[in-house]
Regions:
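Structural detector for internal amphipathic alpha-helices that build alpha-solenoid repeat scaffolds
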Residues: 1-5, 10, 14, 22-38, ...
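Phosphate- and divalent-cation-binding pockets in alpha/beta enzyme and binding domains
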Residues: 11, 135, 168
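Residue-level detector of conserved, well-ordered beta-strand and adjacent loop positions
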Residues: 49, 137, 170
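TPR/TPR-like (Sel1-like) alpha-helical repeat modules
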Residues: 167-178
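Alpha-helical repeat scaffolds
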Residues: 202-205
């Protein structure tokens, strides 16, 4: 896979799809990621359904390495019935960073599986689009939501550094009976946003 020759992709795709040996499939996925190109995207996306988690993880990393070309296929994978495929696609889209993915990842905040929602809040921070701010605030404020998801949303708001998050973050910290991981994350994000926006905040100078 080091040479980057297109002719090398065909046997590698066959190995990824058909070889019964897990190590062979893992190596094929890794090599296809290095080779890149549009023609390797579909077989790698298919490999997100592999029965072996290591193959799925390697295929995800390969798609991240390929980058933008994989965006549309990964967006389609967000509709998969398999939880791990939705997780892997959500993670990969955050790492690739194409702004086209933002609206689709916002929808994943409503996924029934907590792991998908954790990847979604993290990816929205990485995608760095302030369009996600209202949805992230809503998740953070939702007391019925899992604390890891809420903390992830608070952390993402700190990355986005949007002033709209200041009041909700402050309320979360002030209303807490005790400072746990969620409140600690909210406090860190509050400080980050204040530091980034202090000149624009009335009375902060």
């Amino acid at each position: 896979g080091e040479l980057g020759e297109v002719s090398a992709t065909i046997p590698l795709i066959e190995s990824l799809r058909e070889d019964r040996n897990v190590d062979v499939r893992v190596r094929a996925a890794r090599a296809l990621g290095r080779l890149g190109g549009r023609e390797v995207v579909e077989p790698l996306v298919e490999a997100l359904n592999d029965e072996n988690p290591q193959v799925c993880i390697t295929a995800t990393d390969a798609l991240i390495e390929i980058g933008d070309v994989a965006t549309d296929s990964l967006i389609e994978s967000l509709d998969s019935e398999k939880v791990n495929v939705r997780c892997d696609a959500t993670r990969a889209l955050g790492e690739i960073g194409n702004p086209k993915a933002v609206d689709y990842i916002i929808k994943m905040l409503k996924d029934e599986w907590v792991n998908v929602r954790i990847y979604a809040v993290t990816s929205l921070g990485k995608l760095n689009d302030t369009k996600a701010v209202p949805s992230l605030i809503e998740v953070m404020q939702n007391e019925k939501e899992n604390d890891l998801v809420r903390a992830g949303a608070a952390a993402a708001l700190g990355v986005l550094r949007d002033q709209r998050a200041l009041l909700p973050l402050r309320e979360l910290i002030m209303e807490a009976e005790e400072l746990g991981e969620l409140e600690d994350t909210a406090l860190k994000s509050f400080k980050k946003i204040m530091a980034a926006n202090w000149q624009a905040i009335p009375g902060a100078q």
